[in-house]
A protein has these predicted regions:
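FAD-binding core of FAD-dependent oxidoreductases
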Residues: 1-4
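Conserved dinucleotide-binding and phosphotransfer motif residues
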Residues: 107
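Short glycine/threonine-rich loop-to-helix capping motif typified by GTGT followed
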Residues: 91-93, 123-132
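General small-molecule cofactor/ligand-binding pocket signal
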Residues: 110-115
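Short helix-loop capping/hinge segments that flank enzyme active sites or metal/cofactor-binding pockets
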Residues: 71-76, 132-174
Length: 174
C-alpha cells in the first residue's frame, strides 16, 4: 500500500457480510487494515468462518493464516509496473516500492515487473459495475420503509427525493 498499511481482501465467501448495507454485492467484502501482514493474518483467523446469517459463506475450515510461512525457494512475486511508473507518484513512494522489491529479492524471492496495460480501464469498469449493483441494492432505502427519512418532506414524492438526496453520500448519488 502507498500508506504503509496492509489491507487484506479475503476470498469471496471467507468472511461474513451480515450486517453490511449492500452497495455492490460482488465487490462488498470485509477485511482488515493493519500495520503488518502477521496482524492481518491474525484478524482474518478471527473474522473468517461460518455465520448462520450469511448463506454465501464457504463451509471450508478456517486456516491458521498466522502460522503460514511462505517458501522462498521457487516463490515468484510480481508487481504491476503501471502502478509505480505513472505520473503523480511521489518520488519517496516510488523509492520505497523499489527498496521493498530489492529487500524481497535479497530475502530469496524472485520479484518481477509485469505490465498490465488495461489498468487505466479499472476505475471506469468499477463504476459501470458498482453503479448498476448499487441502484438495485439501495433501491429499498426510500425513506418510507427503510433508511433515512427527510424531515423536510411534505408528501410521498418529496419523501423519496429528499430522503435519497439528503441521505445518500456522493459515491451513491453518482
Amino acid at each position: 500500500a502507498f500508506c504503509g498499511l496492509v489491507g487484506l481482501k479475503p476470498t469471496y465467501g471467507r468472511v461474513s457480510r451480515y450486517g453490511i448495507i449492500a452497495y455492490a454485492s460482488s465487490f462488498d467484502q470485509v477485511g482488515p487494515v493493519t500495520k503488518n501482514v502477521k496482524d492481518a493474518a491474525l484478524i482474518l483467523e478471527v473474522i473468517a468462518g461460518k455465520d448462520e446469517f450469511d448463506a454465501t459463506l464457504s463451509s471450508k475450515a478456517v486456516t491458521e493464516f498466522s502460522n503460514l510461512q511462505a517458501p522462498k525457494k521457487n516463490m515468484r512475486i510480481a508487481y504491476i509496473t503501471e502502478t509505480i511508473e505513472t505520473e503523480g507518484i511521489d518520488p519517496e513512494i516510488k523509492a520505497a516500492m523499489y527498496n521493498r522489491v530489492k529487500a524481497l529479492q535479497a530475502d530469496g524471492y524472485t520479484v518481477e515487473p509485469v505490465s498490465f496495460p488495461y489498468l487505466k480501464y479499472a476505475v471506469p469498469t468499477y463504476y459501470v459495475l458498482t453503479t448498476a449493483e448499487a441502484s438495485s441494492n439501495l433501491s429499498r432505502y426510500d425513506g418510507v420503509h427503510f433508511g433515512y427519512r427527510s424531515p423536510n418532506a411534505t408528501d410521498l414524492e418529496s419523501t423519496y427525493k429528499l430522503s435519497r438526496s439528503e441521505g445518500f453520500g456522493e459515491e451513491v448519488k453518482r
